[in-house]
From Swiss-Prot:
Species per Swiss-Prot/TrEMBL record: Francisella tularensis subsp. holarctica (strain FTNF002-00 / FTA)
Catalytic reaction list: tRNA(Met) + L-methionine + ATP = L-methionyl-tRNA(Met) + AMP + diphosphate
Cofactors demanded by this protein: Zn(2+)
Signal peptide: none
Subunit composition and interactions: Homodimer.
Organism superkingdom: Bacteria
Main function: Is required not only for elongation of protein synthesis but also for the initiation of all mRNA translation through initiator tRNA(fMet) aminoacylation.
Pfam families for this protein: tRNA-synt_1g (PF09334), tRNA_bind (PF01588)
GO MF entry, a single one: tRNA binding
Chain ranges for the short sequence motif 'HIGH' region as given in the UniProt record: 11-21
Major subcellular site: cytoplasm
Record protein name field: Methionine--tRNA ligase
Family statement: Belongs to the class-I aminoacyl-tRNA synthetase family. MetG type 1 subfamily.
Cofactor: binding details: Binds 1 zinc ion per subunit.
Gene (UniProt): metG
Length: 674
């Protein structure tokens, strides 16, 4: 039995949850439920992130205390999680004496190791609001990629981190005024001193997502900087000891420690030894943090550094998920697609969204699109039309004609074996968080079950004299195939499975038993387990969302919707001049002095070409060797200061990532792409 501790990013307690939040929590909940069915001791903790200037200012605007604000939203968050069937073992808060004790203890340990220093720095100060501005209360143009409307600590376009004072054309989010600079003494964590600790953690982490590893390599190349862990009063949070409550711990220092506090609280309530799960690195337990891709910096750099230097186990891995779009676009209040969790729950059952997200989720950090038309179609087709329909087609015959008892024989052992043989592949897919693959395997089995029923037509057999035994066996096999499918789906749609368990008179408590057929087993009367989604329900969600936000103040400047910038039209003859070929990457290496380039040696089926490709931020050289890609083979050679580039590899990009093109299996080096 494995000992596994899972955390999910703490939601910020100054607003309601939306479906973008739910994507990450549903992902982790599915994985945790699967681990528990495997018989592992898996503990799932979370809590509310409750500190910082945004909470302080929002509470002030509402005429309530910050404590009242965070209590209100913490309760609402927990209710949303509960109704979405996110089954935390403990839900805590960062604003309590236990977390304060942990934060101060870790700070003192860091300070005793000379990892904390003080220095005066220029801070953004709002002269109108008469206060220092936290990072997220300054916006401007990114100093690295020049993207506009970026926060004062990091760019959401290029991922760069910086100080608010480095922003181009900065403005205060509070007053809209240009901030001035004032000096203030701040406390810094010496991150560069722990670079080896972080790199050792990365090297030992076999489960780290490639995208995370690549981003970390990029940050190391840029050089680590000491981290400002303090904020000036006024601030809602924990005061730094010895500062007379004039300096406070930055929210991103105490927020991850909320994971420790939540788990300690759980241990205290359940008489569990904290050290068995989160002791030093020698512990045999596993620790996983599920997070959004926008907070990788804090969880994969600062957090392992802090833990490794204060006697705590470092994460076994950090799993990041992408963002959510709706109908191919960023969630929008005006279009009604900025859907809050409660708005969805007021109109639809959580199982449908849990299933849809599972059908799209992989182990990669891909953004997920909630296509509402596809959402309706997939829910109706897969859950209702394929899975639940199997039971509804067979249960009546068993209940009425055979005393609600399944047959003592298996009608089609070969088909039964196929359901059983897929168990290992489905297990591996769940373990590796390849939920979309697991769903595809399960639905392929559902198709086979429905084909079996369609072929034997028990409704016709029931009308034929002497076919009673066959009707019994066919329908029993149908119910058993339904039983296997529903067991495989338990981590994804637990409430529907709970209803199915009542109908089947069993409880799935062991993943190993999922593929086993029931023999001479008595079932209950079948009742509908899921109903079809009507388009009107989805339309109402959009309308409810529009109404919710229609009274909000319109933004100061409206951004244009992104448009597909198609290049000038070319003729077919022009296009045919471009010679695209399959190429195998035989060598890949860094280019000394180049920030973005990798040197590739490409085999075109006997012909070798050298290419310099601007893909360094997305790929490690060793990960590219042996891959096939597509290159422009007849591009005129170009002399660069690093050498001669004899072509170009094809890649796609959206400003956030780079993705080289890979042909399907079977394509060989030198083949022409037409």
């Amino acid at each position: 039995m494995r000992k596994i501790l899972v955390t999910n990013a703490l939601p910020y307690a100054n607003g309601d949850l939306h479906l973008g939040h739910m994507l990450g929590y549903i992902q982790s909940d599915i994985w945790v439920r699967f681990q528990k069915l495997q018989g592992n001791q898996c503990i799932f903790v979370c809590g509310s992130d409750t500190h910082g200037t945004p909470i302080m200012l929002k509470a002030k605007s509402l005429g309530i205390t910050p404590e009242e604000l965070v209590t209100k939203y913490s309760n609402r968050h927990l209710q949303d999680f509960t109704d979405f069937e996110i089954n935390f073992d403990n839900y805590h808060s960062t604003h309590n004496s236990l977390n304060k004790e942990i934060v101060e203890d870790i700070y003192n340990k860091l300070n005793n190791k000379n990892l904390i220093s003080k220095k005066a720095i220029a801070q953004a100060y709002d002269p109108e609001a008469k206060m220092f501005l936290p990072d997220r209360f300054v916006k401007g143009t990114c100093p690295k990629c020049k993207a506009e409307d970026q926060y004062g600590d990091s760019c959401e376009v290029c991922g760069a981190t910086y100080d608010p004072t480095e922003l181009i054309n900065p403005r205060s989010v509070i007053s809209g005024q240009s901030p001035i600079q004032k000096n203030s003494e701040h406390f810094f964590f010496d991150l560069p001193a722990l670079e080896k600790n972080i790199k050792d953690w990365i090297e030992s982490n076999t489960l780290l997502q490639p995208e995370v590893a690549n981003k970390l390599a990029e940050w190391f190349e840029q050089g680590l900087q000491s981290w400002d862990i303090s904020r000036d009063a006024p601030y809602f949070g924990f005061a730094i000891p010895g500062t007379n409550e004039q300096k406070f711990f930055y929210v991103w220092l105490d927020a991850p420690m909320g994971y420790i506090a939540s788990f300690k609280d759980y241990c205290n309530k359940n008489n569990i030894n904290f050290g068995d799960f989160w002791g030093d690195s020698s512990s045999e337990s596993e620790l996983y943090h599920f997070i959004g891709k926008d907070i990788i910096y804090f969880h994969a750099l600062f957090w392992p550094a802090i833990l490794s230097s204060t006697g705590y186990k470092t994460p076994t891995s950090v799993f990041a998920n992408g963002f959510l779009t709706v109908n191919g676009k960023k969630m929008s209040k005006s279009r009604g697609t900025f859907i809050q969790a409660r708005t969805y729950l007021d109109n639809l059952e959580p199982s449908y969204l849990r299933y849809y997200f599972a059908s799209r989720l992989t182990s990669r950090i891909d953004d997920i699109d909630l296509n509402l038309e596809e959402f309706v179609t997939k829910s109706n087709s897969d859950i209702v039309g394929k899975v639940v329909n199997i039971a509804s087609r067979c249960a009546g015959f068993i209940y009425k004609k055979f005393d609600a008892t399944l047959s003592g024989e298996i009608f089609d052992p070969e088909l039964e074996s196929e359901f059983s043989k897929n168990h290992d592949a489905i297990t591996q897919a769940f373990e590796k968080r390849e939920f979309a693959h697991a769903v595809r395997l399960i639905m392929a089995l559902a198709d086979k079950a429905n084909q079996f029923i369609d072929y034997h037509k028990p409704w016709q057999l029931a009308k034929e004299e002497g076919q009673e035994q066959k009707v019994h066996q066919v329908c029993s096999q149908g119910i058993n195939m339904f039983k296997v499918l529903i067991a495989y789906l338990k981590p994804i749609i637990p409430s529907i499975v709970a209803e199915a368990e009542r109908f089947l008179n069993i409880q799935f408590i062991s993943w190993a038993d999922a593929p086993k057929f029931l023999i001479n087993h008595k079932i209950d009367k079948f009742k509908p387990l899921a109903t079809r989604i009507e388009k009107e329900k989805v339309d109402k969600i959009l309308e409810d969302t529009k109404k919710m936000f229609e009274n909000e103040q319109a933004p100061q400047s409206k951004k244009e919707e992104p448009k597909l910038d198609i290049a000038a039209e070319c003729t077919f003859d022009d296009f045919m001049k471009v010679d695209l070929r399959i190429a195998k990457i035989t060598e890949a290496s860094h280019v000394e002095g180049a920030d973005k380039l990798l040197k590739l040696i490409l085999d075109l089926g006997g012909v070798t070409k050298q290419v310099f490709a601007g893909i360094k931020s997305a790929y490690k050289p060793e990960d590219l060797i042996g891959k096939h890609t597509i290159m422009v083979a007849n591009l005129a050679p170009r002399k660069m200061k690093f050498g001669m580039s004899e072509g170009m590899v094809l890649a796609a990009g959206d400003g956030k990532g780079i993705y080289i093109l890979e042909p399907h299996e079977g394509a060989q080096p030198g083949m022409r792409v037409k």
